[in-house]
Curated annotation (Swiss-Prot):
Enzyme Commission code: 7.1.2.2
The organism's taxonomic lineage, starting at the top: Bacteria, Pseudomonadati, Bacteroidota, Cytophagia, Cytophagales
Main location: membrane
Positions bound to ATP: G171, D172, R173, Q174, T175, G176, K177, T178
Alphabetized Pfam families for the sequence: ATP-synt_ab (PF00006), ATP-synt_ab_C (PF00306), ATP-synt_ab_N (PF02874)
Designated name of the protein: ATP synthase subunit alpha
Organism (species): Amoebophilus asiaticus (strain 5a2)
């Protein structure tokens, strides 16, 4: 028999005990009382927080929205398969969050930030950020001062948008709302090529999967997916995922905003999000209000849209921002921005309905698209009279301000006079001239699908239009004149175009544009007189 030395035994025991973990961890576990329609009522989670994630025994997750006296109402992310009465659910002690990073650029993700485009997992460094977060306080913001060029003449000239602004796109179905948003994303290609990208996030809420696929195909065709992320919550997904999809988009945008970069988020559309929220609220037995929406539907949209902001350029101030996620510590930079373009669908042009009026009052202006204009072939079908940008004027570049200063007023006046002229009364020469110029301006402001124009192209053509160089040419020749004029300037005056692109404006630039417009217009007038 081998002699055992006491010190050897002690050494072996010490070695074994060194790896022994005696810490006990308490898990708060509840029992599902009832489940149905994507909502689970759980008993036993007495210390749970509002908005906390709950995990079921099969790994599926839900978010606690209703904290009642004897139970918790939790909305399940996705379907409720495998969850039944008596199933266990445990607290995660984590607020709903997603993992965000630059690897998301060019990807299609779902509401939970998981890739759904079949290209494998998201690569690169990822940061955990909460879906719900307080908007930056007043101290950490600065006024909107930098333009966000949409590439759409009617918007950049009359309803300018600045970086950090919230501008509503509102109109009936099939009036070109999504097209307007997609064209804005396509126009950011210029900045991407210059090395100063505006990162775009397109959030599709409650749309057909085929529509989302079509949007993605358009973005890929024009090379816009290189700086764009799509968050997809199609019509077939659960109401809970449609409700949270805009918050996912805002969180991705906030990552770029807080790291000092410009971002643009498009919510297409918030009407469907409100419907999804109404469904969730009614299933949770919350008392319905106007149009059966819950009482806090205004707060739903205000807390989402307030997250769009232009952040103070001072790094030290930006780093003290309220509610910064711990994962971004040491990475926060000032000067970033998040611009929001929410979309709202109206019924028969009724902008005074509940959800439209709510969102109009939250945003910094609205672009109203009209069915009558769209059907008349005026596209984009923007009603200039009731469209407005409350803060974007401060961000408009000098050259655009100079050429389009009175355009909005002139077009509103033209619409009024045109309506009056339909009564058939004799019009004086001045009124006829105003109507004629208004029609030509209207023709100039028309734009083709997925055909955004650069700043310098817009300034040049609007200068010719607003200064009367199109007065003598016929309405049918306006589009042809525009193409010829821009082609001429690109071939013979590249230096002038470069100055306008940099935001410069001078009498010398105006003189070059005036001479070329006058000479070209004369050719069209002579051509018309010869043919007649």
């Amino acid at each position: 028999m081998v002699d055992l030395q006491p010190d050897e035994v002690a050494a072996v025991l010490k070695q074994q005990l060194a790896h022994l973990k005696t810490d006990t961890e308490l898990e708060e576990v509840g029992t599902v009382l009832q489940v149905g329609d994507g909502v689970a009522h759980i008993y036993g989670l007495t210390k749970i927080q509002a908005g906390e994630l709950v995990e079921f025994e099969n790994g599926k997750k839900a978010i606690a929205l209703n904290l009642e006296e004897n139970s918790v109402g939790a909305v399940i992310f996705g379907d409720a398969e495998g969850i039944g009465e008596g199933s266990t659910a445990k607290r995660t002690k984590r607020i709903a969050s997603i993992h965000v990073g630059e690897g998301m650029i060019g990807r299609v993700v779902n509401t939970l930030g998981e890739p759904i485009d079949g290209k494998g997992p998201i690569k690169g460094e990822l940061y955990e950020m909460p879906l719900e977060r307080k908007a930056p306080g007043v101290l950490y913001r600065q006024p909107v001062a930098e333009p966000l060029q949409t590439g759409i003449k009617a918007i950049d000239a009359m309803i300018p948008i600045g970086r950090g602004q919230r501008e509503l796109i509102i109109g009936d179905r099939q009036t070109g709302k999504t097209t307007l948003a997609i064209d804005t994303i396509l126009n950011q290609r210029t900045y991407f090529e210059q090395g100063n990208p505006v990162y775009c996030i397109y959030v599709a809420i409650g749309q057909k999967a085929s529509t989302i696929a079509s949007v993605m195909a358009s973005l890929e065709k024009y090379g816009a997916m290189e700086y764009t992320t799509i968050v997809a919550a199609p019509a077939a997904t659960a109401a809970s995922l449609q409700y949270f999809a805009p918050f996912t988009g805002a969180t991705i945008g906030e990552y770029f905003r807080d790291t000092g970069k410009p971002a643009l988020v498009i919510y297409d559309d918030l009407s469907k999000q409100a419907v999804a929220y109404r469904e969730v609220s009614l299933l949770l037995r919350r008392p319905p209000g106007r149009e059966a929406y819950p009482g806090d539907v205004f707060y739903l949209h205000s807390r989402l849209l307030e997250r769009a902001a232009k952040i103070n350029a001072n790094d030290d101030i930006a780093q003290q921002m309220n509610d910064l996620p711990p994962s971004l510590e040491g990475k926060v930079k000032g000067g970033g921005s998040l611009t929001a373009l929410p979309i709202i669908e109206t019924q028969n042009g009724d902008v005074s309905a509940y959800i439209p009026t709510n969102v109009i009052s939250i945003t910094d202006g609205q672009i109203f698209l009209e069915s009558a204009l769209f059907n008349a072939g005026i596209r984009p079908a923007i009603n200039v009279g009731i469209s407005v940008s409350r803060v974007g004027g401060a961000a408009q570049v000098k050259a655009m301000k100079k050429v389009a200063g009175t355009l909005k007023l002139d077009q509103a006046q033209f619409r009024e006079l045109e309506a009056f002229s339909k009564f058939g009364s004799d019009l004086d020469v001045a009124t006829q001239r105003t109507i004629d110029r208004g029609r030509k301006n209207q023709e100039i402001l028309k734009q083709g699908l997925h055909h955004p124009l650069t700043l310098e192209e817009q300034v040049c053509i609007l200068y010719a239009s607003t200064n009367g160089y199109l007065d003598k040419i016929s309405l049918s020749q306006v589009t042809e004149f525009e193409k010829s004029y821009l082609s001429l300037l690109k071939s013979q005056h590249k230096g002038v175009l470069a100055k306008i692109a940099a935001g410069e404006w001078s009498d010398g630039i105006a003189q070059v544009l005036a001479e070329e417009a006058k000479n070209l217009a004369q050719l069209y007038v002579n051509d018309t007189s010869i043919n007649s």
